[in-house]
């Protein structure tokens, strides 16, 4: 698994176990949906995120989506930490693009990215995953680089 598990005692090996056939699927994308918690101090915020694990799913991302709920998002895991670059081509709504280190801490946040922009949004260092949320949500919830931590309650592998 790329990010730490939500439950104490969950091992990395169990985090890499294939998801059961009954895994929740998103009605629009068909992608697996997992629980993800962002911790900021003692505050824990729960999200249901789609896992864009395949190259095709990562290339499409949230293109053409017209809405994204406050507790919804999409995560783009990497097999190994690597520099990541995203753009907003064909993306209708503003997004917060959150770059996540292998230990689950936030490396950086690109707030309220501009819809349809072809300007690359890049990580400042190699990252293990990228989380996209509704634009403005990271600031509203006071997520901060290095002080906020993501925890996955599902399989996060590519």
Q: How would you name each of these model-derived features?
A:
Residues 2-5:
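C-terminal motif of bacterial Sec signal peptides marking the signal peptidase cleavage site
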Residues 7-158:
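Compact, glycine-rich, soluble single-domain proteins
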